[in-house]
Amino acid sequence: MLFNKDKNNIGGRSIESTGFAWWSGNARLINLSGKLLGAHVAHAGLIVFWTGAMTLFETSHFIPEKPLYEQGMILLPHLATLGWGVAPGGEIVNTYPYFATGVIHLVSSAVLGFGGIYHSIVGPDVLEDSFSFFGYDWRDKNKMTTILGIHLILLGIGAFLLVIKALFIGGIYDTWAPGGGDIRFITNPTLNPAIIFSYLLKSPFGGEGWIVGVNNMEDVIGGHIWIGVTCVIGGIWHILTRPFSWARRAFVWSGEAYLSYSLGALALMGQTAAEYAWYNNTVYPSEFYGPTAAEASQAQAFTFLVRDQRLGANIASTQGPTGLGKYLMRSPTGEVILGGETMRFWDLRAPWLEPLRSSNGLDLNKIKNDIQPWQERRAAEYMTHAPLGSLNSVGGVATEINSVNYVSPRSWLTTSHFFLGFFIFIGHLWHAGRARAAAAGFEKGINRENEPVLSMRPLD
């Protein structure tokens, strides 16, 4: 049966038939797999539509003379990071790939939108009777783990798509490429599990930075290979096996429980993305997203070091007002670092600064003889584009927020992902509590008999 026979009684529309009012959203469709499919497909269509429309909006407003991070872009930097339309140094030279990406997403959203409307209005209320493969029962533990397995395989394929792009299809932008960044093929991805999985065991503080501390594209692509393999193998495992008895006892098996698990995973992803957007300058290259806070502070110290060195200052021995080195000093571990208040960020790693290091920190000989013009230009640009706001000359502290002229994409992305992740985590707790209460057999939510909406005039 490809359609709903009774057009005047589409499932999930009334509180009498579902037990939920209209504002309860998809809760009305808990037992209507066909209509829930329509809601999910339509939701995917909305997401893809926003992506396509916003990509075209950013492309139409793009100014070649300005860096992306000065133009409030949040989608084009992602496409540039993938190596589309980029020249050495992160210069955007071709916007056609961005236009094509936007159009492809718009067309895809139309297909998804049609599918969502079809399954919401025309398609069968439930899939179990007509399409048993797509049908399900929330209590069917084996079916639920099969669906989990399918999702894991799709996630693995997504990870492999990035790997294929970096290894075979045009390469990927590497901010660490010599001379200030370039597109290159990742020919030797890191496959050593000791290296890849050691990131999970690193301290989240300082230069270690947990998984956010990754600072080379070989590890990034190697990590995606491991993620892809793990997800595909895990997906096949969950499709072919039944849940063990301990898993059957440990988990709550209901639609709301699965929702809570999903929200918990999304919250973790959102918080991790926020950390990446704020701290990492490898997968979020500063050429596209603007400098990190630490990078802007170091850039300021570096810029004034270059200026004063040209004016004859002895950068090796000059002391600042506190008696510490004005230009260079020692870190807590004995490395030579930039002086002044940048000591807060002494363990920063950035492509424009690393060529001046040796085994014991910054190399005085390199600083005196090897500083390149592109390093000076980049530091001068980053100095005035901190994600915190504009910097003054005191030493890297934001004293006056310059939000009228510049707000860093790092600020937008970090703040949005942090708060979305936080509130999604609250949703995880809420639905987990309701699911556990239902499984335990006691009352949850408000009393349906006295629900305010029952005394209100119907919307139609």
UniProtKB/Swiss-Prot annotation:
TM region positions: 56-80, 121-142, 165-187, 242-262, 278-299, 434-458
InterPro entries attached to this UniProt entry: PS_antenna-like (IPR000932), PS_II_antenna-like_sf (IPR036001), PSII_PsbC (IPR005869), PSII_PsbC_sf (IPR044900)
Membrane topology: Multi-pass membrane protein
Keywords, comma-separated and alphabetical: Chlorophyll, Chloroplast, Chromophore, Manganese, Membrane, Metal-binding, Photosynthesis, Photosystem II, Plastid, Thylakoid, Transmembrane, Transmembrane helix
Keyword Manganese found: yes
GO MF terms held by the record: chlorophyll binding; electron transporter, transferring electrons within the cyclic electron transport pathway of photosynthesis activity; metal ion binding
GO cellular component terms listed in the entry, alphabetical order: chloroplast thylakoid membrane; photosystem II
UniProt KW Thylakoid keyword: yes
Location(s), subcellular: Plastid, Chloroplast thylakoid membrane
Cofactor note: Binds multiple chlorophylls and provides some of the ligands for the Ca-4Mn-5O cluster of the oxygen-evolving complex. It may also provide a ligand for a Cl- that is required for oxygen evolution. PSII binds additional chlorophylls, carotenoids and specific lipids.
Propeptide regions on this chain: 1
GO biological process: photosynthetic electron transport in photosystem II
Residues that, per the record, bind [CaMn4O5] cluster: 354
HAMAP family in UniProt: PSII_PsbC_CP43 (MF_01496)
Subunit details: PSII is composed of 1 copy each of membrane proteins PsbA, PsbB, PsbC, PsbD, PsbE, PsbF, PsbH, PsbI, PsbJ, PsbK, PsbL, PsbM, PsbT, PsbY, PsbZ, Psb30/Ycf12, at least 3 peripheral proteins of the oxygen-evolving complex and a large number of cofactors. It forms dimeric complexes.
Function: One of the components of the core complex of photosystem II (PSII). It binds chlorophyll and helps catalyze the primary light-induced photochemical processes of PSII. PSII is a light-driven water:plastoquinone oxidoreductase, using light energy to abstract electrons from H(2)O, generating O(2) and a proton gradient subsequently used for ATP formation.
Family: Belongs to the PsbB/PsbC family. PsbC subfamily.
Name this polypeptide is given: Photosystem II CP43 reaction center protein
Taxonomic source organism: Cyanidium caldarium (Red alga)
Gene responsible for this protein: psbC
